[in-house]
Design a protein with these regions (language model features):
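C-terminal outer-membrane beta-barrel translocator/porin domains of Gram-negative envelope proteins
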Residues: 4, 14-19, 23-150
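Outer-membrane beta-barrel transmembrane domain signature
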Residues: 4-5, 137-147, 154-189
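Solvent-exposed loop/turn segments connecting transmembrane beta-strands
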Residues: 8-9, 42-50, 124-131, 183-186, ...
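A short, hydrophobic secondary-structure junction motif
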Residues: 15, 40-46, 81-90, 160-177, ...
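Residue-level detector of the transmembrane beta-barrel scaffold of outer-membrane proteins
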Residues: 17, 34-36, 75-79, 135, ...
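Composition- and surface-driven signal marking solvent-exposed, interaction-prone regions
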Residues: 50-53, 71-75, 148-155, 177-181, ...
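Active-site lining segments that contact anionic ligands and/or coordinate catalytic metals
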Residues: 75, 116-118, 129-135, 158-164, ...
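Outer-membrane beta-barrel "beta-signal"
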Residues: 193-197, 212-223
Length: 223
């Protein structure tokens, strides 16, 4: 679905998250796994939106490839993310008698494009009832670190930086169907430069797709 459609992004509800983290370091994991199940629900109690339910699941896995003569750290990182809004096609009439769909807002729904998933596309480029996205990253941390020797920048305390290559494959669909979600999937490919600045990972991602290219700047790894 084209994200240019008008959606209500104001909501009042609750979110339940079950997070199991078996990695060595949450800030920059090198091995282990992490799973996260999230259920968000809005009962429409404040009449700010119609009721809706959104379910998301994510599995991330990391493999430490060890050091080399020039690499301080090499990591293969994989991520699977999927989302569904089971109330998507149900409707009800609000106080004004207008029929409203029970659909989650963009920031809680099944969206691709932007800072975390399908980074070669604009934010919320694809939006529908269901979505799936696969990501693979190769994270290379060189032993060479020029930042402590650069005036002014050396005050930022940058102990390491990374060069990252990534590939993403995913799509949205009007129902959660394994076959539908794996047809004509969208692809993002690109690279990233990341650095630890005051205990926070800062990243600049550059990605290309069939629709062009995007530059995404944010903090923390995408997963």
């Amino acid at each position: 679905m084209d994200s240019g459609a008008l959606y209500q992004n104001k909501t009042s509800g609750v979110k339940f998250t079950l997070d199991y983290n078996n990695t060595d370091w949450y800030n920059n994991p090198t091995h282990g796994t992490r799973q996260r199940l999230t259920v968000a629900r809005d009962w429409g109690l404040l009449d700010e939106s119609s009721t809706w339910t959104a379910i998301q699941f994510r599995h991330s896995q990391f493999f430490n490839l060890g050091e080399t003569e020039k690499a301080r750290q090499r990591v293969l990182a994989f991520d699977i993310w999927t989302s569904d809004v089971p109330t998507w096609n149900s409707t009800s009439r609000n106080g004004d008698g207008v029929e409203a769909f029970h659909r989650a807002p963009l920031f809680e729904g099944s969206t691709l494009g932007g800072l975390e998933r399908q980074r070669a596309f604009p934010s919320n480029r694809f939006h529908d009832r269901s979505a799936i996205n696969y990501t693979a990253e190769y994270r290379y941390m060189p032993k060479w670190n020029p930042f402590p020797n650069i005036p002014l920048i050396n005050t930022l305390h940058i102990p390491w930086w990374q060069w990252v290559g990534y590939l993403e494959v995913g799509r949205v669909a009007d129902n959660w169907s394994f076959s539908d979600l794996h047809k004509k999937m969208k692809v993002s490919a690109g690279g990233s430069v990341r650095a630890m600045v005051y205990e926070l990972v800062i990243r600049v991602d550059v990605g290309v797709s069939e629709e062009g290219s995007e530059v995404q700047m944010f903090f923390n790894h995408p997963f």
